[in-house]
Amino acid sequence: MGRWASESRAPGTMRGGAWTAERSEGPHLRTEMMETLLFTDERCLLHETPYSHPESPKRLRKILDSLAAEPVPGTEQATVRPATRDELLLVHEVRHVDAILELRGRSTQLDVDTWLSPGSVDAALLAAGATVEAVRALKEGRARNAFVLVRPPGHHAESNRSMGFCIFNNVALAAAVARKQLGVERILIAGWDFHQGNGTQESFWDRSDVLCFSTHRKPPFYPQTGTLE
């Protein structure tokens, strides 16, 4: 694959609903590794939430439209796949995974602020699978960087429950795959959010090879976790 020219803004093209910046063919810019792979899928928009809910499809739609109108040089969209049940079981309990999968195609409320629409389970599987594939791409040397642009989010989802807009824990799953299947010996997960990633913390609380670093508002504040103690 070719590297993008970084000194000028490249026009974009649409390919099957995906955007890509046009590639420079200058020999001095050729390389075997893509600069940044973008993992996203418009099917993540199928996760619909109630009117005025802060985790809205409009958030992702706005970003995708902006990227289509003004592509970022040095990026290319990668193929996204759903996470498998076996992958989900690396961080989630069987009863939680199976309970969510049984709700595919249905609308329901999982907790006070976490909802499912008919497309939510498929969107959640794609979000988790995209994060796993991003880690694989980096480990295999297919890109220097990866950016995962998906929804629903994941860092509040614990091993046995969905919460805080999150259904499956995308980042925890990717870290588990990296550690158990890709031979990564040490992992740093940096969380930058107003709310602490309680689900990610729970996934690796007893492990010395995964460090979860988080900047967040301290309790008393949702999800009431993340104190210095």
Task: Place the predicted regions along the sequence by residue.
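Serine residues within intrinsically disordered or low-complexity segments
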Residues: S6-S8, S24
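Short, Lys/Arg-enriched N-terminal segments with co-localized hydrophobic residues
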Residues: R23-M33
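N-terminal low-complexity, Ser/Thr- and acidic-residue-enriched intrinsically disordered segments
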Residues: M34-E87
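Charged, often glycine-rich, active-site loop that binds/positions anionic groups
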Residues: R81-G105
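Short glycine/proline- and acidic residue-enriched helix-loop micro-motifs
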Residues: Q109-D122
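Glycine-rich anion/phosphate-binding loops
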Residues: G119-V132
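Conserved alpha-helical scaffold segments that buttress catalytic/binding sites
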Residues: V132, R136, F147-E229
